[in-house]
């Protein structure tokens, strides 16, 4: 049986930008079953975000094809900061911050990759043991300053200044690849396009110290842009996190289900494990019946399940269906808070109040006349029930958990009213 061609699959999915030695990597994959590959992430925060999924999806595909992925947490480099993609110096973190972030990221990665045929390493293990004299003698002599200055990541910072600390980051990352290659048999490094210079520096160091025939390869990923030309990865509310405490499964699901028709097929290829045939079928449905949003629903389903599991997906779908249909009575307070986090909000007292006054006082309606008209026309729902009597009294004692009264105006215009 022929081997699965992982590189061709990645190309079809639009996941490869540059390769250092495609022919050499293909030859290695054809002759060996033991490829190990890695990508690094510095513990600059306590949660991964969807931008991290871009390289991680490639590692996951290699893992599913039987290869050995390694994620390198930059406990050493994270204390310094990668200048790639930045115009200003990073604020250095305390040792306590770095340690806390490392633990949080490790737990998230284990959820994505499991524990079989997967490894998490920390470069503090070896970088922390190198003193300045050893650094200069054993590694520094292999790096030419003129070459380092010409790397894009450094050249773009020279005008405004770059510290020696960040200038040496590429040497530290090169040491990482050298260490993992020599001691752990890692042959391939994955990174974003802005990591090309750091990756090639690592390969050069390996070849200088271990010989030019030592297998060492690099692969970078294209910059993910949306159809409107903006960078992928942000929602209207900012970063989309993998931590459910920062971005709830419902918000996460909504991010994917609201993707543009022009982007959705690209994201299906990149962020799901659906087959070529399944994706092509969804592409056809998007073209013929875009209003059904079949591709967006499948995208949201697959990525939410991958990150938050079956339970997180079911909850996200339950909240979505309830808010869409208006049948919200079976939602828990936590689910209501998830679903209406970004909805307009208001406050009201704990006393009963006529519905017309309630709507005006909470600024849901601009005037009593408009409030009466909307109530009579059946456009107002209180906690899921349509109220058409202008004499109806809103009773806070019937609020969800004694805390929230939910007003819906029209089909899906919700306001979350907190009872004080």
Curated annotation (Swiss-Prot):
Motif ('KMSKS' region): 231-235
Keyword field: Aminoacyl-tRNA synthetase, ATP-binding, Cytoplasm, Ligase, Nucleotide-binding, Protein biosynthesis, RNA-binding
InterPro entries (alphabetical): aa-tRNA-synth_I_CS, aa-tRNA-synth_Ic, Rossmann-like_a/b/a_fold, S4_RNA-bd_sf, SYY-like_C, Tyr-tRNA-ligase, Tyr-tRNA-ligase_bac-type, Tyr-tRNA-ligase_bac_1
Motif ('HIGH' region) on chain: 43-52
Residues spanning the signal sequence: none
Pfam families the record matches: SYY_C-terminal, tRNA-synt_1b
TM helices/strands, residue ranges: none
Gene Ontology cellular-component terms listed: cytosol
Similarity comment: family membership: Belongs to the class-I aminoacyl-tRNA synthetase family. TyrS type 1 subfamily.
Subunit structure: Homodimer.
Protein's name according to its UniProt entry: Tyrosine--tRNA ligase
């Amino acid at each position: 049986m022929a081997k699965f061609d992982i590189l061709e699959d990645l190309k079809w999915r639009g996941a490869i930008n540059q390769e250092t030695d495609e022919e050499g990597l293909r030859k290695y994959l054809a002759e060996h079953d033991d490829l190990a590959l890695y990508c690094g992430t510095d513990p600059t925060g306590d949660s991964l975000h969807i931008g991290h999924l871009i390289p991680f999806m490639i590692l996951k595909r290699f893992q599913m094809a039987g290869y050995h992925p390694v994620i390198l947490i930059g406990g050493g480099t994270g204390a310094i900061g990668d200048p790639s993609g930045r115009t200003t110096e990073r604020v250095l973190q305390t040792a306590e911050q770095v340690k806390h972030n490392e633990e949080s990221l490790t737990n998230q990665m284990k959820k994505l990759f499991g524990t079989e045929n997967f490894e998490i390493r920390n470069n503090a293990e070896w970088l922390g043991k190198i003193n300045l004299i050893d650094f200069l003698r054993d590694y520094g002599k292999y790096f030419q300053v003129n070459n380092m200055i010409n790397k894009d990541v450094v050249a773009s910072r020279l005008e405004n200044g770059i510290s020696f600390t960040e200038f040496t980051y590429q040497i530290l990352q090169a040491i990482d690849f050298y260490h993992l290659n020599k001691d752990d048999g890692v042959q391939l490094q994955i990174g974003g396009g802005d990591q090309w210079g750091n990756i090639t520096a690592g390969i050069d160091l390996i070849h200088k110290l271990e010989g030019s025939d030592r297998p060492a390869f690099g692969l970078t990923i294209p910059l993910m842009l949306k159809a409107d030309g903006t960078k992928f990865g942000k929602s209207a509310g900012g970063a989309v996190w993998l931590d459910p405490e920062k971005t709830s499964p419902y918000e996460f699901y909504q991010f994917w289900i609201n993707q543009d028709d022009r982007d959705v097929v690209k994201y299906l290829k990149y962020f799901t494990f659906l087959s070529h045939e399944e994706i092509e079928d969804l592409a056809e449905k998007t073209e013929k019946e875009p209003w059904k949003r079949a591709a967006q629903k499948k995208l949201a389903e697959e990525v939410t399940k991958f990150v938050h599991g079956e339970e997180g997906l079911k909850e996200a779908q339950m909240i979505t269906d309830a808010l869409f249909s208006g049948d919200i009575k079976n939602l828990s307070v936590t689910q209501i808070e998830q679903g209406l986090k970004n909805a307009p909000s208001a406050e009201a007292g704990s006393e009963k109040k006529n519905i017309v006054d309630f709507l005006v006082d909470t600024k849901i309606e601009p005037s009593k006349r408009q409030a009466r008209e909307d109530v009579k026309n059946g456009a107002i729902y209180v906690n899921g029930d349509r109220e058409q009597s202008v004499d109806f009294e809103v009773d806070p004692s019937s609020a969800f958990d004694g805390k929230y009264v939910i007003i819906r105006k029209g089909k899906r215009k919700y306001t979350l009213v907190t009872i004080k």
